[in-house]
Amino acid sequence: MAATPPSSQHRRPLSSSASAASLAGKPRGGGLLLGRYELGRLLGHGTFAKVYQARSADSGEPVAIKVLDKEKAMRHGLVPHIKREIAILRRVRHPNIVRLFEVMATKSKIYFVMELVRGGELFGRVAKGRLKEDTARRYFQQLVSAVGFCHARGVFHRDLKPENLLVDEHGDLKVSDFGLSAVADQFHPDGLLHTFCGTPSYVAPEVLARRGYDGAKADIWSCGIILFVLMAGYLPFHDQNLMAMYRKIYRGEFRCPRWFSKDLSSLLNRILDTNPETRITVKEVMESRWFQKGFRPVRFYVEDDQVHSLADGDNDMPELEPSEPPPPPPFPPPPPQQDDDGEESGWESDSSVASCPATLSSEERRQRPLGSLTRPASLNAFDIISFSKGFDLSGLFEERGSEVRFISAEPMQTIITKLEEIAKVKSFFVRRKDWRVSIEGTREGLKGPLTIGAEIFELTPSLVVVEVKKKAGDKEEYDDFCNRELKPGMQHLVHHMGSVPNIPSDTE
């Protein structure tokens, strides 16, 4: 269910006996939903969910809230799908993908607090007639950029169609409704997906054939159908008889209208290739002449779990106050326990209210002291030692997947300055906020620019821990940066200790 009104054939008004309050858990008498959101009008609904416009009571920011009935979801076996959608939306943070802010639950309802996209569905725009080529191209560029970003993170949408593409007030496209999405770990031993899903008019022939299919190739087929619809105003494969339409899809029987340019027709013929082995890839689409015209790769960074788009030339780094810098935050605790879906466990607890924030709220960001984070105020020696492999705090570089940590006795400003110098060697952009540094690469790719976060935590009054982790981008590029630039450049700042430092206890 998209966070905007669905197309007219799916929308119906609430009956007189059912109000928004009773359906969504909105308190009677104008109260707040779970004490946090003012629920507004119903935007639309499907079989299992309703979407309401709402407003944050703390910040006043408008949001969309998707409400699901927990009992109905469990009865129809949708709980794994819901959990997977939550995990996927947190994995694919991109300017052209609808954002998930928070997930809340009561004993009877599940609430998705999402970005409110005011412009409506792309379907509504094309229903009025075909689009101009430059307009269609811009939407297609944003669609393919978002889809390629998802694929690079092992996510395959599987239900791409104009009804699931929204347009915001700035005219930018947003991909929504990941309810049928698959992740790479769902592949069968043959490396393919086997579940039939999607809308027949937009589904690739190998999916209709109910044989194993490549999720990325199936998604790019759907993108081609969408492009054809935007440019022609009708579907390339259409027939009143469903089986006749299937035959046309299997055979690839379609014709481009005479107003399609040669480059566009060539691109569509390569996308709508019935053989997935020879079908064009996302990378090849993005390199095509028709796609490249006027294309500006999206540039963005993620900070505090918020997606921030960058305008051209917006590379300035916010300066730290030159006077007394804020104290560094305490050393971070271990990440929360996660279940097999990569989602924090406990969301379907029997407690009356459970909340699983995807980001800090605007109010929390305003109230948070400069330089502090939402972490415990203090940790004892055992907590800190447990972070280091084998209880070893010798100061050597420690690697944990996409994270690198080391201990230093150097002044924090010296460490930050060195990080900036290393980044500039690679012509990376640098952003500073308190004792955090964000290093952003310039090389574009399906995964977006490489983004590295570095943060300094106080271990003792004389020692700090520096934590570096990949926040976005290609892992190989990150590993190369760490091995060739970061580790050699920071090695002289690493503090080598003969024993574990004297860490104050909680009672001191």
Swiss-Prot record:
Molecular function as annotated in GO: ATP binding; protein serine kinase activity; protein serine/threonine kinase activity
Biased composition (Acidic residues): 313-322, 338-347
Keywords per UniProt: ATP-binding, Kinase, Manganese, Nucleotide-binding, Serine/threonine-protein kinase, Transferase
Region (PPI): 401-430
Protein kinase domain boundaries: 37-291
Family, similarity comment: Belongs to the protein kinase superfamily. CAMK Ser/Thr protein kinase family. SNF1 subfamily.
Full protein name: CBL-interacting protein kinase 19
Higher taxonomy: Eukaryota, Viridiplantae, Streptophyta, Embryophyta, Tracheophyta
